[in-house]
């Protein structure tokens, strides 16, 4: 299943394909956690204990698997205290699962749910990363391409600026010329590859591209993934038509 949404930076989509079909959110939910942190009254300079013990939505306790995390740095700080700001940055720049659950533990699930609601999303992310007990109980993080597009359009400039630091640039970013600014978040597990970004061409207005793929091309690797190459091809094609997006949205 391939879902695509193309829209101006602010405005209704100009192209949709399976736009409201739900996909497993994977790490795209980290953008919503970041927005919830930004909109909270939490002190980003406060120091947070780095632990690997979290409360499941079922009431049990779970932890993250270090081998499944794309960012080793937060794991090296286990038992220490680090600034919340650093965790928020690692969550979106290197897609740290451990940092995500630590941030989620600070801000709370209701605040993240409010981010999705304000964006106009039908889906959301009601549980943390690797909360297997909640997943077995039917609590799933599901989003559509339209949900992700609306989320990006709802974000404050400061949140988008942090999303520009995403270092995983093998899908939508790989389809753009070098140096093109984009703010977004991607996610991948076996069977799923998603990516949504606000792209800033120098010669055209900003546009949002959101692509969700569920199927056999998604091998679950952060690099050398056929599904990532598919998303890059889509991104390249949209880039070539970037001058028509704003006009089509009027």
Report each predicted region and the residues it spans:
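Mid-domain, small-residue-enriched loop/turn segments at the edges of structured enzyme/sensor domains
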Residues: 1-2, 80-84, 94-152
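Short pre-catalytic segments that frame enzyme active sites
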Residues: 1-24, 39-41
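Active-site SXXK
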Residues: 24-50, 91, 209
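Short glycine/serine- and small hydrophobic-enriched flexible loop segments
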Residues: 35-42, 105, 150-156, 236-240
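A conserved catalytic-loop motif detector
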Residues: 137-178
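Conserved catalytic neighborhood of penicillin-recognizing serine enzymes
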Residues: 56-101, 109
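Second-shell loop/turn segments in exported
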Residues: 16-23, 73-78, 86-90, 98-104, ...
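Structured C-terminal helix/loop/strand segments within mature extracytoplasmic catalytic/sensor domains
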Residues: 10-14, 22, 106-108, 156-170, ...
């Amino acid at each position: 299943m391939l879902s695509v949404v193309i829209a101006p930076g602010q405005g209704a989509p100009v192209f949709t394909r399976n736009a409201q079909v739900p996909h497993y959110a994977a790490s795209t939910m980290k953008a919503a956690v970041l927005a919830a942190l930004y909109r909270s009254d939490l002190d980003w300079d406060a120091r947070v204990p780095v632990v690997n013990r979290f409360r499941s939505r079922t009431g049990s306790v779970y932890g993250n698997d270090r081998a499944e995390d794309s960012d080793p740095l937060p794991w090296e700080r286990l038992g220490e205290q680090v600034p919340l700001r650093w965790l928020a940055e690692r969550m979106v720049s290197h897609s740290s699962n451990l940092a995500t659950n630590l941030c989620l533990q600070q801000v709370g699930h209701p605040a993240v749910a409010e981010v999705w609601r304000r964006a106009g999303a039908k889906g959301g992310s009601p549980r943390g990363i690797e909360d297997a007990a909640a997943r077995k109980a039917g609590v799933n993080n599901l989003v559509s391409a339209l949900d992700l597009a609306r989320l990006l359009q709802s974000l404050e400039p400061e949140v988008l600026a942090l999303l520009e630091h995403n270092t995983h640039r093998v899908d939508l970013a790989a389809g753009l010329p070098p140096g093109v600014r984009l703010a977004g978040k991607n996610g991948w597990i076996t069977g799923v590859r998603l990516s949504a970004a606000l792209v800033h061409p120098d010669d055209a207005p900003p546009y949002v591209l959101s692509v969700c793929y569920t199927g056999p091309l998604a091998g679950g690797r952060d690099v050398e993934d056929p599904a990532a190459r598919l998303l890059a091809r889509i991104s390249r094609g949209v880039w070539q038509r970037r001058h028509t997006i704003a006009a089509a949205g009027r």
